[in-house]
């Protein structure tokens, strides 16, 4: 089943059509342009409910359901994007070969990265700067919803990460107010399984 989805995602990418799919952890449909596909994750230029580009999302191929190509409302969406002068300046150079490579490349290109652990913690996300990635875990210096950096970074299991977002309006607003974090002291690093 995942292989059939990959074929359809590659079709969406090569034909530059808007994809629409349902994701079991979100309410409603997700819409966007598929920009690249890796072994596990694919890169999507997200089109939000206001018919505007709103950053990028990397979803697990195995998590998407009811993929529609093209989006049944593609003509309307394309016309609205055009009228609003919405465009993607360029595809970000995100390495999708593995989750650690994805996280490192997104962290290098964008000021903040959002991770989701939708199976373990539905409805929650964690936003911050990647400090370190090991074979099994991610060390993330997190920022709270008030744009205040936590004093200690948190560790997350890579196996629990189901989605990675970056370049969206919310991440940009947090960075605008919170700025860059001060480097944490090694002795204060929080551990998370």
Model regions and ranges:
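Short glycine-rich, low-complexity segments
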Residues: 1-29, 47-123, 144-193
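Short beta-strand-centered aromatic/proline hotspots
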Residues: 28-36, 125-132
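N-terminal beta-strand/beta-hairpin edge segment
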Residues: 34-50
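Preference for intrinsically disordered or flexible, low-complexity segments
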Residues: 35-38, 134-136, 160, 187
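Short aromatic-glycine-enriched beta-strand elements
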Residues: 41-44, 136-140
């Amino acid at each position: 089943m995942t292989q059939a989805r990959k074929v359809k995602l590659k079709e969406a990418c090569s034909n530059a059509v808007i994809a629409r799919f349902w994701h079991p952890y979100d309410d409603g449909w997700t819409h966007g342009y598929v920009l690249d596909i890796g072994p596990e994750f694919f890169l999507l230029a997200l089109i939000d409910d206001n018919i505007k580009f709103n950053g990028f999302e990397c979803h697990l191929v195995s998590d998407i359901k009811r993929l529609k190509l093209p989006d049944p409302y593609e003509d309307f969406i394309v016309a609205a994007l055009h009228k609003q002068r919405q465009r993607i300046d360029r595809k970000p150079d995100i390495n999708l070969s593995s989750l650690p490579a994805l996280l490192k490349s997104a962290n290098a290109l964008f000021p903040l990265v959002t991770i989701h652990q939708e199976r373990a913690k539905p409805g929650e996300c964690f936003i911050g700067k990647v400090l370190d990635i090991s074979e099994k875990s991610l060390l993330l210096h997190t920022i709270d919803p008030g744009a205040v950096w936590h004093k200690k970074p948190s560790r997350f299991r890579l196996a629990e990460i189901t989605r990675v977002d970056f370049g969206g309006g919310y991440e940009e607003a947090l960075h605008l107010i919170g700025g860059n974090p001060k480097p944490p002291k090694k002795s204060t690093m929080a551990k998370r399984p």
